[in-house]
Protein backbone atom coordinates (compact mmCIF):
# COMPACT_ATOMS: atom_id res chain seq x y z
CA UNK A 1 0.00 0.00 0.00
CA UNK A 2 1.58 3.25 -1.20
CA UNK A 3 -0.38 6.25 0.08
CA UNK A 4 1.75 8.62 -2.02
CA UNK A 5 0.85 6.80 -5.23
CA UNK A 6 -2.78 6.63 -4.06
CA UNK A 7 -2.91 10.40 -3.57
CA UNK A 8 -1.19 11.08 -6.89
CA UNK A 9 -4.12 9.19 -8.39
CA UNK A 10 -6.57 11.10 -6.18
CA UNK A 11 -5.11 14.44 -7.30
CA UNK A 12 -5.51 13.31 -10.91
CA UNK A 13 -9.17 12.58 -10.19
CA UNK A 14 -9.60 16.00 -8.52
CA UNK A 15 -8.08 17.74 -11.54
CA UNK A 16 -10.38 15.78 -13.84
CA UNK A 17 -13.38 16.90 -11.76
CA UNK A 18 -12.27 20.53 -12.03
CA UNK A 19 -11.81 20.11 -15.78
CA UNK A 20 -15.32 18.69 -16.20
CA UNK A 21 -16.62 21.65 -14.20
CA UNK A 22 -14.97 24.00 -16.69
CA UNK A 23 -12.54 25.40 -14.13
CA UNK A 24 -9.46 23.95 -15.84
CA UNK A 25 -8.59 23.30 -19.50
CA UNK A 26 -8.48 19.76 -20.83
CA UNK A 27 -5.28 17.78 -21.53
CA UNK A 28 -3.11 18.88 -18.60
CA UNK A 29 0.18 16.97 -18.50
CA UNK A 30 0.44 15.35 -15.05
CA UNK A 31 3.88 13.81 -15.68
CA UNK A 32 5.68 16.23 -13.35
CA UNK A 33 3.16 16.07 -10.50
CA UNK A 34 4.77 14.67 -7.35
CA UNK A 35 3.32 13.70 -3.98
CA UNK A 36 5.94 13.46 -1.25
CA UNK A 37 6.47 14.00 2.48
CA UNK A 38 6.73 17.73 3.30
CA UNK A 39 10.19 18.91 4.29
CA UNK A 40 8.77 20.06 7.61
CA UNK A 41 6.54 17.36 9.17
CA UNK A 42 4.72 20.16 10.97
CA UNK A 43 3.17 21.19 7.65
CA UNK A 44 1.30 17.92 7.20
CA UNK A 45 1.61 14.33 6.07
CA UNK A 46 1.75 14.81 2.28
CA UNK A 47 2.78 17.66 -0.01
CA UNK A 48 2.27 18.11 -3.75
CA UNK A 49 3.72 20.43 -6.37
CA UNK A 50 0.68 19.94 -8.66
CA UNK A 51 -0.37 23.60 -8.69
CA UNK A 52 3.18 24.83 -9.26
CA UNK A 53 3.88 22.62 -12.28
CA UNK A 54 0.40 22.89 -13.86
CA UNK A 55 -0.39 26.60 -13.36
CA UNK A 56 1.18 27.85 -16.60
CA UNK A 57 -0.51 25.16 -18.69
CA UNK A 58 -3.79 25.81 -16.86
CA UNK A 59 -3.44 29.55 -17.55
CA UNK A 60 -3.80 30.52 -13.90
CA UNK A 61 -1.52 31.34 -10.98
CA UNK A 62 -0.21 28.54 -8.72
CA UNK A 63 -1.93 29.75 -5.55
CA UNK A 64 -5.32 29.97 -7.21
CA UNK A 65 -4.94 26.46 -8.64
CA UNK A 66 -3.76 25.15 -5.26
CA UNK A 67 -6.87 26.61 -3.59
CA UNK A 68 -9.11 24.91 -6.17
CA UNK A 69 -7.38 21.59 -5.52
CA UNK A 70 -7.51 22.06 -1.75
CA UNK A 71 -11.26 22.66 -1.86
CA UNK A 72 -11.75 19.51 -3.91
CA UNK A 73 -9.52 17.34 -1.70
CA UNK A 74 -11.18 18.53 1.53
CA UNK A 75 -14.17 16.46 0.45
CA UNK A 76 -12.09 13.27 0.73
CA UNK A 77 -12.82 11.59 4.09
CA UNK A 78 -9.15 10.60 4.37
CA UNK A 79 -8.10 14.28 4.39
CA UNK A 80 -8.48 16.19 7.66
CA UNK A 81 -6.75 19.36 6.48
CA UNK A 82 -5.66 20.82 3.11
CA UNK A 83 -3.63 24.04 3.20
CA UNK A 84 -1.75 26.13 0.67
CA UNK A 85 1.79 27.23 1.51
CA UNK A 86 4.39 29.45 -0.12
CA UNK A 87 4.02 30.06 -3.87
CA UNK A 88 1.53 27.22 -4.32
CA UNK A 89 2.52 24.06 -2.47
CA UNK A 90 -0.44 22.04 -1.25
CA UNK A 91 -0.05 20.28 2.11
CA UNK A 92 -2.41 17.54 3.28
CA UNK A 93 -2.98 16.13 6.72
CA UNK A 94 -4.52 12.67 6.80
CA UNK A 95 -6.84 10.90 9.22
CA UNK A 96 -5.11 8.52 11.67
CA UNK A 97 -7.05 5.60 10.17
CA UNK A 98 -5.11 6.05 6.91
CA UNK A 99 -1.86 5.24 8.69
CA UNK A 100 -3.46 2.46 10.70
CA UNK A 101 -4.49 0.91 7.38
CA UNK A 102 -0.88 1.12 6.17
CA UNK A 103 0.30 -0.68 9.32
CA UNK A 104 -2.26 -3.42 8.71
CA UNK A 105 -1.16 -3.67 5.07
CA UNK A 106 2.48 -3.96 6.15
CA UNK A 107 1.61 -6.78 8.54
CA UNK A 108 -0.51 -8.60 5.96
CA UNK A 109 2.01 -8.18 3.11
CA UNK A 110 5.08 -9.25 5.06
CA UNK A 111 8.24 -9.16 2.95
CA UNK A 112 6.27 -7.87 -0.06
CA UNK A 113 5.42 -4.58 1.68
CA UNK A 114 7.03 -1.67 -0.13
CA UNK A 115 8.02 -3.76 -3.15
CA UNK A 116 6.97 -2.50 -6.56
CA UNK A 117 4.95 -4.39 -9.16
CA UNK A 118 6.99 -5.98 -11.96
CA UNK A 119 7.72 -3.48 -14.73
CA UNK A 120 8.84 -4.16 -18.31
CA UNK A 121 12.43 -3.80 -19.48
CA UNK A 122 15.73 -5.29 -18.37
CA UNK A 123 18.23 -3.28 -16.32
CA UNK A 124 21.92 -4.16 -16.67
CA UNK A 125 23.97 -2.90 -13.72
CA UNK A 126 27.73 -3.15 -14.23
CA UNK A 127 29.78 -2.61 -11.11
CA UNK A 128 33.23 -3.27 -9.67
CA UNK A 129 34.93 -4.28 -12.98
CA UNK A 130 38.29 -3.85 -11.23
CA UNK A 131 41.32 -4.65 -13.36
CA UNK A 132 42.41 -8.26 -12.66
CA UNK A 133 45.84 -7.09 -11.55
CA UNK A 134 45.62 -7.30 -7.76
CA UNK A 135 43.44 -7.35 -4.67
CA UNK A 136 40.57 -4.92 -4.34
CA UNK A 137 41.13 -1.67 -2.49
CA UNK A 138 38.65 0.35 -0.44
CA UNK A 139 37.66 2.48 -3.44
CA UNK A 140 36.65 -0.66 -5.32
CA UNK A 141 34.63 -1.59 -2.25
CA UNK A 142 32.56 1.58 -2.46
CA UNK A 143 31.62 0.92 -6.08
CA UNK A 144 30.93 -2.73 -5.29
CA UNK A 145 28.59 -1.94 -2.40
CA UNK A 146 26.87 0.87 -4.30
CA UNK A 147 26.29 -1.29 -7.39
CA UNK A 148 25.09 -4.29 -5.41
CA UNK A 149 22.70 -2.22 -3.29
CA UNK A 150 21.43 -0.38 -6.37
CA UNK A 151 20.72 -3.71 -8.10
CA UNK A 152 18.85 -4.89 -4.99
CA UNK A 153 16.92 -1.62 -4.86
CA UNK A 154 15.91 -1.82 -8.52
CA UNK A 155 14.75 -5.40 -8.06
CA UNK A 156 12.71 -4.32 -5.02
CA UNK A 157 11.10 -1.55 -7.07
CA UNK A 158 9.92 -4.07 -9.65
CA UNK A 159 12.69 -4.16 -12.23
CA UNK A 160 14.32 -7.24 -13.74
CA UNK A 161 18.05 -6.83 -13.12
CA UNK A 162 21.25 -8.40 -14.45
CA UNK A 163 24.39 -7.79 -12.36
CA UNK A 164 27.55 -7.70 -14.44
CA UNK A 165 31.33 -7.52 -14.02
CA UNK A 166 33.52 -6.55 -17.00
CA UNK A 167 36.90 -8.28 -16.86
CA UNK A 168 39.52 -5.96 -18.37
CA UNK A 169 41.75 -8.79 -19.56
CA UNK A 170 42.85 -7.46 -22.96
CA UNK A 171 44.84 -4.32 -22.16
CA UNK A 172 48.49 -3.54 -21.51
CA UNK A 173 47.93 -3.80 -17.76
CA UNK A 174 47.57 -7.60 -17.92
CA UNK A 175 50.92 -7.85 -19.72
CA UNK A 176 52.42 -5.86 -16.84
CA UNK A 177 50.73 -8.31 -14.47
CA UNK A 178 52.29 -11.23 -16.35
CA UNK A 179 55.80 -9.74 -16.14
CA UNK A 180 55.29 -9.01 -12.43
CA UNK A 181 54.12 -12.58 -11.79
CA UNK A 182 57.04 -13.96 -13.83
CA UNK A 183 59.41 -12.06 -11.55
CA UNK A 184 57.80 -13.74 -8.52
CA UNK A 185 58.04 -17.08 -10.36
CA UNK A 186 61.79 -16.58 -10.69
CA UNK A 187 61.93 -15.59 -7.01
CA UNK A 188 60.11 -18.79 -6.04
CA UNK A 189 62.75 -20.77 -7.94
CA UNK A 190 65.53 -19.14 -5.92
CA UNK A 191 66.58 -16.27 -8.19
CA UNK A 192 67.59 -13.04 -6.45
CA UNK A 193 65.25 -10.53 -8.09
CA UNK A 194 66.30 -7.45 -6.10
CA UNK A 195 64.02 -4.43 -5.98
CA UNK A 196 60.85 -4.62 -8.07
CA UNK A 197 61.51 -2.58 -11.24
CA UNK A 198 59.46 0.56 -11.72
CA UNK A 199 56.34 -0.10 -13.76
CA UNK A 200 55.71 -3.58 -12.34
CA UNK A 201 53.27 -4.43 -9.54
CA UNK A 202 55.21 -4.49 -6.23
CA UNK A 203 52.76 -6.08 -3.78
CA UNK A 204 53.39 -9.32 -1.90
CA UNK A 205 50.08 -10.69 -3.21
CA UNK A 206 51.89 -12.01 -6.31
CA UNK A 207 54.28 -14.20 -4.31
CA UNK A 208 51.75 -17.07 -4.01
CA UNK A 209 51.14 -16.80 -7.77
CA UNK A 210 54.86 -17.13 -8.39
CA UNK A 211 55.02 -20.19 -6.13
CA UNK A 212 52.10 -21.86 -7.90
CA UNK A 213 53.70 -21.15 -11.27
CA UNK A 214 56.89 -22.80 -10.02
CA UNK A 215 54.92 -25.82 -8.76
CA UNK A 216 53.11 -26.13 -12.09
CA UNK A 217 55.91 -25.45 -14.58
CA UNK A 218 59.11 -26.09 -12.67
CA UNK A 219 61.98 -24.30 -14.43
CA UNK A 220 60.52 -24.80 -17.92
CA UNK A 221 59.38 -21.21 -18.40
CA UNK A 222 62.90 -19.92 -17.69
CA UNK A 223 64.04 -21.53 -20.93
CA UNK A 224 61.33 -19.83 -23.01
CA UNK A 225 61.48 -16.40 -24.66
CA UNK A 226 59.02 -13.80 -23.40
CA UNK A 227 56.81 -14.27 -26.46
CA UNK A 228 56.26 -17.88 -25.35
CA UNK A 229 55.96 -17.54 -21.55
CA UNK A 230 54.03 -14.25 -21.39
CA UNK A 231 50.61 -15.59 -22.58
CA UNK A 232 50.97 -18.63 -20.30
CA UNK A 233 51.82 -16.55 -17.23
CA UNK A 234 49.25 -13.90 -18.16
CA UNK A 235 46.36 -16.40 -18.27
CA UNK A 236 47.54 -18.04 -15.05
CA UNK A 237 47.88 -14.70 -13.24
CA UNK A 238 44.53 -13.33 -14.47
CA UNK A 239 42.77 -16.47 -13.24
CA UNK A 240 44.52 -16.16 -9.86
CA UNK A 241 43.61 -12.47 -9.55
CA UNK A 242 39.97 -13.11 -10.46
CA UNK A 243 39.85 -15.83 -7.77
CA UNK A 244 41.24 -13.27 -5.32
CA UNK A 245 38.69 -10.65 -6.41
CA UNK A 246 35.80 -13.12 -6.20
CA UNK A 247 36.87 -14.03 -2.67
CA UNK A 248 36.95 -10.34 -1.71
CA UNK A 249 33.50 -9.81 -3.23
CA UNK A 250 32.10 -12.83 -1.40
CA UNK A 251 33.47 -11.48 1.90
CA UNK A 252 31.46 -8.32 1.27
CA UNK A 253 28.32 -10.19 0.16
CA UNK A 254 28.60 -8.93 -3.43
CA UNK A 255 27.27 -11.10 -6.22
CA UNK A 256 27.22 -10.94 -10.02
CA UNK A 257 25.20 -12.86 -12.59
CA UNK A 258 27.66 -12.33 -15.45
CA UNK A 259 31.45 -12.03 -15.67
CA UNK A 260 32.15 -10.70 -19.18
CA UNK A 261 35.66 -10.97 -20.63
CA UNK A 262 36.97 -8.11 -22.76
CA UNK A 263 39.00 -10.62 -24.77
CA UNK A 264 35.83 -12.20 -26.13
CA UNK A 265 35.13 -8.95 -27.98
CA UNK A 266 38.40 -9.09 -29.91
CA UNK A 267 38.61 -12.77 -30.83
CA UNK A 268 37.87 -14.18 -34.27
CA UNK A 269 38.49 -12.69 -37.70
CA UNK A 270 38.01 -9.11 -38.88
CA UNK A 271 38.57 -7.70 -35.42
CA UNK A 272 35.93 -9.79 -33.69
CA UNK A 273 32.90 -8.09 -32.17
CA UNK A 274 34.66 -4.71 -32.13
CA UNK A 275 35.40 -4.86 -35.85
CA UNK A 276 31.86 -6.00 -36.63
CA UNK A 277 30.42 -3.18 -34.54
CA UNK A 278 32.55 -0.54 -36.30
CA UNK A 279 31.44 -1.95 -39.67
CA UNK A 280 27.80 -1.71 -38.56
CA UNK A 281 28.23 1.89 -37.42
CA UNK A 282 29.96 2.72 -40.70
CA UNK A 283 26.93 1.40 -42.60
CA UNK A 284 24.76 3.75 -40.55
CA UNK A 285 26.98 6.68 -41.55
CA UNK A 286 28.29 7.06 -38.01
CA UNK A 287 31.97 6.29 -38.72
CA UNK A 288 34.18 8.42 -40.95
CA UNK A 289 37.82 9.34 -41.50
CA UNK A 290 38.60 12.87 -40.43
CA UNK A 291 40.90 15.14 -38.46
CA UNK A 292 39.85 16.49 -35.08
CA UNK A 293 40.62 20.16 -34.37
CA UNK A 294 42.84 20.71 -31.34
CA UNK A 295 40.58 21.25 -28.33
CA UNK A 296 40.84 24.40 -26.26
CA UNK A 297 42.85 24.16 -23.06
CA UNK A 298 44.55 20.92 -22.04
CA UNK A 299 44.82 18.30 -24.78
CA UNK A 300 43.04 15.01 -24.01
CA UNK A 301 44.99 11.77 -24.23
CA UNK A 302 43.14 10.55 -27.32
CA UNK A 303 43.78 13.65 -29.48
CA UNK A 304 46.29 13.29 -32.31
CA UNK A 305 47.05 15.68 -35.17
CA UNK A 306 46.31 13.22 -37.99
CA UNK A 307 43.49 11.68 -40.00
CA UNK A 308 41.63 9.22 -37.79
CA UNK A 309 38.73 6.79 -37.88
CA UNK A 310 36.09 8.63 -35.86
CA UNK A 311 32.66 7.89 -34.39
CA UNK A 312 30.08 10.67 -34.84
CA UNK A 313 29.31 10.94 -31.15
CA UNK A 314 28.39 14.63 -31.54
CA UNK A 315 25.25 13.45 -33.36
CA UNK A 316 24.12 12.03 -30.02
CA UNK A 317 25.02 14.89 -27.69
CA UNK A 318 28.78 14.45 -27.14
CA UNK A 319 31.16 17.43 -27.29
CA UNK A 320 33.48 15.99 -29.97
CA UNK A 321 33.65 12.96 -32.24
CA UNK A 322 35.74 10.12 -30.83
CA UNK A 323 38.61 8.05 -32.30
CA UNK A 324 38.07 4.31 -32.75
CA UNK A 325 41.58 3.32 -33.88
CA UNK A 326 44.99 4.17 -32.42
CA UNK A 327 47.90 5.22 -34.60
CA UNK A 328 49.24 1.64 -34.51
CA UNK A 329 45.97 0.30 -35.94
CA UNK A 330 44.68 -1.27 -32.72
CA UNK A 331 41.31 -0.38 -31.28
CA UNK A 332 40.92 2.38 -28.72
CA UNK A 333 39.42 1.56 -25.33
CA UNK A 334 36.36 3.47 -26.47
CA UNK A 335 35.87 1.14 -29.45
CA UNK A 336 35.93 -1.89 -27.16
CA UNK A 337 33.55 -0.16 -24.76
CA UNK A 338 31.06 0.51 -27.56
CA UNK A 339 31.14 -3.17 -28.56
CA UNK A 340 30.71 -4.22 -24.94
CA UNK A 341 27.67 -1.99 -24.43
CA UNK A 342 26.25 -3.16 -27.75
CA UNK A 343 26.51 -6.68 -26.31
CA UNK A 344 24.44 -5.60 -23.30
CA UNK A 345 21.77 -4.20 -25.62
CA UNK A 346 21.83 -7.35 -27.77
CA UNK A 347 21.24 -9.40 -24.61
CA UNK A 348 18.01 -7.48 -23.98
CA UNK A 349 19.02 -4.60 -21.70
CA UNK A 350 16.96 -1.44 -22.13
CA UNK A 351 18.38 0.45 -19.15
CA UNK A 352 22.15 0.32 -18.68
CA UNK A 353 23.85 1.54 -15.50
CA UNK A 354 27.65 1.73 -15.18
CA UNK A 355 29.11 2.24 -11.70
CA UNK A 356 32.58 3.75 -12.11
CA UNK A 357 35.26 5.65 -10.23
CA UNK A 358 35.19 9.44 -10.16
CA UNK A 359 38.12 9.59 -12.60
CA UNK A 360 35.78 8.40 -15.38
CA UNK A 361 33.87 11.68 -15.60
CA UNK A 362 35.05 12.31 -19.16
CA UNK A 363 33.67 8.93 -20.19
CA UNK A 364 30.01 9.71 -19.56
CA UNK A 365 28.88 11.72 -22.60
CA UNK A 366 30.70 9.59 -25.16
CA UNK A 367 29.29 6.32 -23.81
CA UNK A 368 25.77 7.70 -23.54
CA UNK A 369 26.10 8.75 -27.18
CA UNK A 370 27.39 5.30 -28.12
CA UNK A 371 24.50 3.50 -26.38
CA UNK A 372 21.95 5.68 -28.16
CA UNK A 373 23.69 4.90 -31.47
CA UNK A 374 23.99 1.12 -31.10
CA UNK A 375 20.43 0.75 -29.75
CA UNK A 376 18.80 3.14 -32.24
CA UNK A 377 17.54 5.06 -29.22
CA UNK A 378 15.85 2.05 -27.59
CA UNK A 379 18.29 1.89 -24.65
CA UNK A 380 19.75 4.48 -22.30
CA UNK A 381 22.86 4.64 -20.11
CA UNK A 382 23.22 6.18 -16.68
CA UNK A 383 26.76 6.43 -15.31
CA UNK A 384 27.10 6.63 -11.53
CA UNK A 385 30.48 7.93 -10.41
CA UNK A 386 31.76 6.94 -6.97
CA UNK A 387 34.07 9.40 -5.29
CA UNK A 388 37.17 8.56 -3.28
CA UNK A 389 37.21 6.92 0.14
CA UNK A 390 39.56 8.39 2.74
CA UNK A 391 40.46 5.67 5.20
CA UNK A 392 41.00 6.97 8.74
CA UNK A 393 41.53 5.60 12.22
CA UNK A 394 40.52 8.00 14.97
CA UNK A 395 40.71 10.84 12.46
CA UNK A 396 44.23 9.97 11.23
CA UNK A 397 44.99 8.57 7.74
CA UNK A 398 45.67 4.83 7.61
CA UNK A 399 49.02 3.75 6.18
CA UNK A 400 49.33 1.61 3.07
CA UNK A 401 49.34 -2.17 3.08
CA UNK A 402 52.53 -4.17 2.65
CA UNK A 403 50.52 -6.92 1.00
CA UNK A 404 49.13 -4.64 -1.70
CA UNK A 405 52.21 -2.45 -1.90
CA UNK A 406 50.40 0.81 -2.62
CA UNK A 407 47.03 0.80 -0.82
CA UNK A 408 44.96 -0.71 1.97
CA UNK A 409 43.11 -3.77 0.72
CA UNK A 410 39.37 -4.13 1.01
CA UNK A 411 39.80 -7.50 2.72
CA UNK A 412 41.92 -5.91 5.48
CA UNK A 413 39.10 -3.46 6.21
CA UNK A 414 36.40 -6.18 6.18
CA UNK A 415 38.48 -8.39 8.47
CA UNK A 416 38.93 -5.54 10.95
CA UNK A 417 35.42 -4.05 11.20
CA UNK A 418 33.10 -6.60 9.55
CA UNK A 419 30.89 -6.67 6.48
CA UNK A 420 27.91 -4.74 7.87
CA UNK A 421 29.74 -1.53 8.87
CA UNK A 422 31.54 -1.47 5.51
CA UNK A 423 28.34 -1.89 3.52
CA UNK A 424 26.15 0.51 5.51
CA UNK A 425 28.72 3.29 5.81
CA UNK A 426 29.62 3.08 2.12
CA UNK A 427 25.93 3.81 1.46
CA UNK A 428 25.43 6.47 4.13
CA UNK A 429 26.83 9.17 1.88
CA UNK A 430 25.83 10.00 -1.68
CA UNK A 431 28.06 8.23 -4.18
CA UNK A 432 29.44 11.41 -5.76
CA UNK A 433 30.66 12.84 -2.43
CA UNK A 434 34.03 11.94 -0.91
CA UNK A 435 33.62 9.50 1.98
CA UNK A 436 35.65 9.56 5.20
CA UNK A 437 35.60 5.99 6.53
CA UNK A 438 36.91 5.92 10.09
CA UNK A 439 37.76 2.40 11.25
CA UNK A 440 37.32 3.41 14.89
CA UNK A 441 33.99 5.20 14.54
CA UNK A 442 32.19 2.53 12.49
CA UNK A 443 32.41 0.05 15.38
CA UNK A 444 31.30 2.48 18.10
CA UNK A 445 28.08 1.60 19.91
CA UNK A 446 26.46 5.02 19.81
CA UNK A 447 23.85 7.10 18.00
CA UNK A 448 26.71 8.67 16.05
CA UNK A 449 27.38 5.32 14.37
CA UNK A 450 24.47 4.89 11.91
CA UNK A 451 24.92 1.16 11.27
CA UNK A 452 24.89 0.38 14.99
CA UNK A 453 21.91 2.68 15.58
CA UNK A 454 19.77 1.05 12.88
CA UNK A 455 20.73 -2.53 13.75
CA UNK A 456 20.18 -1.78 17.44
CA UNK A 457 16.63 -0.67 16.63
CA UNK A 458 15.94 -4.03 14.99
CA UNK A 459 17.48 -5.88 17.93
CA UNK A 460 15.30 -3.88 20.32
CA UNK A 461 12.16 -4.89 18.39
CA UNK A 462 13.18 -8.52 18.93
CA UNK A 463 13.59 -7.88 22.66
CA UNK A 464 10.09 -6.34 22.76
CA UNK A 465 8.63 -9.56 21.39
CA UNK A 466 10.66 -11.71 23.78
CA UNK A 467 9.25 -9.65 26.65
CA UNK A 468 5.72 -9.89 25.21
CA UNK A 469 5.87 -13.68 24.96
CA UNK A 470 6.84 -13.85 28.62
CA UNK A 471 4.07 -11.45 29.63
CA UNK A 472 1.38 -13.08 27.48
CA UNK A 473 2.24 -16.78 27.10
CA UNK A 474 0.11 -18.50 24.48
CA UNK A 475 -0.92 -15.23 22.79
CA UNK A 476 -0.71 -15.32 18.99
CA UNK A 477 1.79 -12.57 18.21
CA UNK A 478 2.19 -13.32 14.52
CA UNK A 479 1.93 -10.34 12.13
CA UNK A 480 -1.31 -11.75 10.74
CA UNK A 481 -2.88 -11.91 14.22
CA UNK A 482 -1.57 -8.47 15.20
CA UNK A 483 -3.17 -6.96 12.08
CA UNK A 484 -6.47 -7.36 13.93
CA UNK A 485 -5.36 -5.22 16.89
CA UNK A 486 -7.19 -1.97 17.67
CA UNK A 487 -4.81 0.59 16.17
CA UNK A 488 -7.01 3.51 17.20
CA UNK A 489 -5.35 3.14 20.62
CA UNK A 490 -2.08 4.45 19.12
CA UNK A 491 -2.64 8.10 20.01
CA UNK A 492 0.77 9.32 21.19
CA UNK A 493 2.72 11.63 18.87
CA UNK A 494 5.66 9.20 18.97
CA UNK A 495 3.43 6.39 17.72
CA UNK A 496 2.07 8.66 15.00
CA UNK A 497 5.63 9.51 13.90
CA UNK A 498 6.48 5.82 13.53
CA UNK A 499 3.29 5.13 11.56
CA UNK A 500 3.99 8.02 9.17
CA UNK A 501 7.51 6.76 8.57
CA UNK A 502 6.36 3.18 7.98
CA UNK A 503 3.91 4.59 5.42
CA UNK A 504 6.79 6.28 3.59
CA UNK A 505 8.67 3.03 2.94
CA UNK A 506 7.03 2.12 -0.41
CA UNK A 507 7.72 5.61 -1.71
CA UNK A 508 11.33 5.53 -0.50
CA UNK A 509 11.89 2.30 -2.46
CA UNK A 510 10.24 3.74 -5.56
CA UNK A 511 11.97 7.15 -5.41
CA UNK A 512 15.43 5.83 -4.50
CA UNK A 513 15.17 3.22 -7.25
CA UNK A 514 14.09 5.76 -9.88
CA UNK A 515 16.89 8.15 -8.89
CA UNK A 516 19.49 5.34 -8.64
CA UNK A 517 20.34 6.61 -5.14
CA UNK A 518 20.49 3.88 -2.46
CA UNK A 519 21.77 6.38 0.11
CA UNK A 520 18.17 7.61 0.39
CA UNK A 521 17.19 4.25 1.85
CA UNK A 522 20.08 4.34 4.34
CA UNK A 523 19.01 7.83 5.49
CA UNK A 524 15.39 6.70 5.81
CA UNK A 525 16.30 3.67 7.92
CA UNK A 526 18.26 5.91 10.29
CA UNK A 527 15.26 8.24 10.61
CA UNK A 528 12.93 5.30 11.28
CA UNK A 529 15.33 3.86 13.87
CA UNK A 530 15.58 7.26 15.53
CA UNK A 531 11.78 7.52 15.85
CA UNK A 532 11.66 4.06 17.42
CA UNK A 533 14.48 4.76 19.89
CA UNK A 534 12.80 8.05 20.86
CA UNK A 535 9.52 6.32 21.67
CA UNK A 536 11.40 3.58 23.55
CA UNK A 537 13.01 6.27 25.70
CA UNK A 538 9.61 7.90 26.29
CA UNK A 539 8.42 4.64 27.80
CA UNK A 540 11.25 4.71 30.34
CA UNK A 541 9.76 7.87 31.86
CA UNK A 542 6.08 7.13 31.19
CA UNK A 543 5.14 3.53 32.06
CA UNK A 544 1.81 3.85 30.21
CA UNK A 545 3.77 4.23 26.94
CA UNK A 546 5.86 1.09 27.31
CA UNK A 547 5.50 -1.42 24.50
CA UNK A 548 4.51 -4.25 26.84
CA UNK A 549 2.08 -3.64 29.69
CA UNK A 550 0.98 -6.85 31.39
CA UNK A 551 -2.12 -5.16 32.82
CA UNK A 552 -3.27 -3.71 29.47
CA UNK A 553 -3.47 -6.42 26.84
CA UNK A 554 -5.26 -4.26 24.23
CA UNK A 555 -2.72 -1.44 24.26
CA UNK A 556 0.11 -3.96 24.24
CA UNK A 557 -1.25 -5.71 21.15
CA UNK A 558 -1.72 -2.36 19.40
CA UNK A 559 1.87 -1.36 20.08
CA UNK A 560 3.15 -4.80 19.13
CA UNK A 561 1.37 -4.42 15.78
CA UNK A 562 3.23 -1.14 15.26
CA UNK A 563 6.55 -2.69 16.34
CA UNK A 564 6.00 -5.67 14.04
CA UNK A 565 5.38 -3.36 11.06
CA UNK A 566 8.45 -1.28 11.88
CA UNK A 567 10.52 -4.43 12.41
CA UNK A 568 9.52 -5.74 8.99
CA UNK A 569 10.49 -2.46 7.31
CA UNK A 570 13.87 -2.34 9.08
CA UNK A 571 14.64 -5.94 8.07
CA UNK A 572 13.49 -5.34 4.49
CA UNK A 573 15.47 -2.12 4.09
CA UNK A 574 18.62 -3.54 5.64
CA UNK A 575 18.27 -6.57 3.38
CA UNK A 576 18.19 -4.34 0.29
CA UNK A 577 21.38 -2.65 1.51
CA UNK A 578 22.92 -6.09 2.09
CA UNK A 579 23.20 -5.56 5.85
CA UNK A 580 22.05 -8.08 8.46
CA UNK A 581 19.12 -7.37 10.80
CA UNK A 582 20.25 -8.90 14.13
CA UNK A 583 17.90 -9.96 16.92
CA UNK A 584 20.63 -9.30 19.48
CA UNK A 585 23.64 -6.97 19.58
CA UNK A 586 26.86 -8.45 20.86
Curated annotation (Swiss-Prot):
Catalytic activity: tRNA(Arg) + L-arginine + ATP = L-arginyl-tRNA(Arg) + AMP + diphosphate
Motif 'HIGH' region boundaries: 130-140
GO cellular-component term (any): cytoplasm
Gene Ontology molecular function: any one: arginine-tRNA ligase activity
Main location as per UniProt: cytoplasm
Keywords: Aminoacyl-tRNA synthetase, ATP-binding, Cytoplasm, Ligase, Nucleotide-binding, Protein biosynthesis
Annotated InterPro entries: aa-tRNA-synth_I_CS (IPR001412), Arg-tRNA-ligase (IPR001278), Arg-tRNA-synth_N (IPR005148), Arg-tRNA-synth_N_sf (IPR036695), ArgRS_core (IPR035684), DALR_anticod-bd (IPR008909), Rossmann-like_a/b/a_fold (IPR014729), tRNAsynth_Ia_anticodon-bd (IPR009080)
Protein localization: Cytoplasm
Coiled-coil regions listed in the entry: none
Enzyme Commission number: 6.1.1.19
Listed GO biological process terms: arginyl-tRNA aminoacylation
HAMAP family named among the record's database cross-references: Arg_tRNA_synth
Family of the protein in this entry: Belongs to the class-I aminoacyl-tRNA synthetase family.
NCBIfam families xref list: argS
Subunit organization: Monomer.
Record-given protein name: Arginine--tRNA ligase
Gene this protein is translated from: argS
